[in-house]
Amino acid sequence: MKRYIALLLALTLLLSGCTAAQQTEKTETSTQTEITEETEETRETVETPEDDNSFGLSYLPEYGLNPYTCTATVNRALFSLLYESLFSISTQFRAEPVLCESYRMIDEGRTYVFTLVEGATFSDGTPLTAEDVEASIQAARSSSYYKFRLSRISYYTTQEDGTLLIQVSTPYENLPLILDIPVVKKESVSEAYPVGTGPYKLQGDRLVRNGHWKQTQEPVLDRDTIELSACGSTGELRDNFEFGSTDLVYCDPNNAASVGYRCDYEVWEVPTTVMHYLGFNLYSGYFANNTLRSAVTYLLDREEIVTEFYGGFALGSSLPCSPYSDLYDAQLAESYDYAPTQFRAALQESGILTSPEYEYHQGIFLVCSDDMVRVETARYIARLLNDAGLNIVVSALDHDTYLKELNDGDFDLYYGETRLTPNFDLSEFFRSDGNLQYGSIKSTSLAELCTAALENTGSFVELCAQVAQEAPICPVVFKSYAVYVTRGKITSLTPTVDNVFHDSASARSLADADKTYENADPTMD
């Protein structure tokens, strides 16, 4: 999604160094929504540098450029220039083959065999092998950013024919969706600046073209050199972008760390899998009542929440899935969308307002004070609940205290954040060893539905329907990140969370690589 903005005014641009790990609270007929919204404002513009072909990027060197350990959002903008992965994930959360030429699914989805693109080479001239991919997966399994998505991978090895074999503990219909992991040379996986196969390579304080790059099309960012500026603070990042030495900034525009700046830019919105949601205590307090709990979704005007508290950089969803994903069912989502009269009817039916048990009850609403967007949103939701007749008090706590209270179960509800996988696997909420089962929401039946949805994506709608009915959680929004670019420096961009310079025009389809049913050996099925 691109928004055109030409203006000279003070803004709150978030150049935060850090993003949340895979589970941020713990350590923490299908309709596709069109992604084409354009708005325009015209005010006084700022002159751009005469050398329109120059391009600069800033980064925070203390975080390095290792894709498995780096948590600096601004640094991750460089990853799609330096590294490639077996698959890339589009803005519609579809897997697109990159370093994978083809693959086969066997053993009813428990085993995958991947064939690499022929002739792919690292920037130092050494050929890419399945052993490099194997080493990259191993590094990712130890990474807070990737490890949860890979938890079901039980075995992987390089085969004699040079292919990569991956086995999973439960059948996967679409394993490529979680394999958008940067691949680096196996000898460099632990280095701060690993060797990759991307269109550029690091050379001193600049990026230069990788002469060994396999792809035939020109990269989205088509420059011979890209100047890098090492920064020690978000203030330096702001100054570099404002005064022209940096032409692109990738950030979470709703992060707590923010700086103001003045410049002329274009901005692209980046859909993410980061979900903000209400979690409930199922065994004490107001929301132990299922009738009330399952009706909270009707009280939430998500469009207003997105506008008022997220500055438009989020997408409301009553389902635990981004509306941009093929898994999203618009008809089901609509049935659980904003309908305040239905909430009030359910509140009356619940008997909460007339029950002596709740006459003096004070409901505790936990939220992490490190994130003011979540705090303000929680306060807004609390006002709605109180206006309806409940007695809710927001308790905004520092991160460590917040997690302790969640683990102790001392709450009625909380406003949480988690980074879901691109296939929107909800298992961490419901399986017995899950990391997000605050409020005793673990559920054998829901965990089984999560597994069924991995095996057959058609089961995801049933999972969403059951989650909405039982309401252990209530999705509110999916966050968006932003790519700010000096006006005129890039004309076309379709950025994704881990591929800022994603090129949708030249992307291959997953069907192009799927050879599961092509000349299949019946003895392997």
Regions found by a protein language model. Give the residues of each.
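Ligand/substrate-recognition segments at binding pockets and active sites
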Residues: 350-420
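Extracytoplasmic/peripheral linker and loop segments enriched in polar/acidic and small residues
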Residues: 394-402, 427-489, 519-525
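Extracellular/periplasmic solute-recognition and catalytic clefts
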Residues: 157, 203-206, 227-283
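Gly/Pro-rich hinge or "lid" segments in bacterial periplasmic/extracellular proteins
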Residues: 167, 171-227, 233-235, 512-519, ...
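Structural transition elements
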Residues: 314-352, 373-374
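Long beta-strand-rich cores associated with HINT superfamily self-processing modules
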Residues: 486-525
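Periplasmic-binding protein-like
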Residues: 283, 287-326, 464-472
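N-terminal lobe/hinge region of extracytoplasmic solute-binding protein
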Residues: 57-105, 138
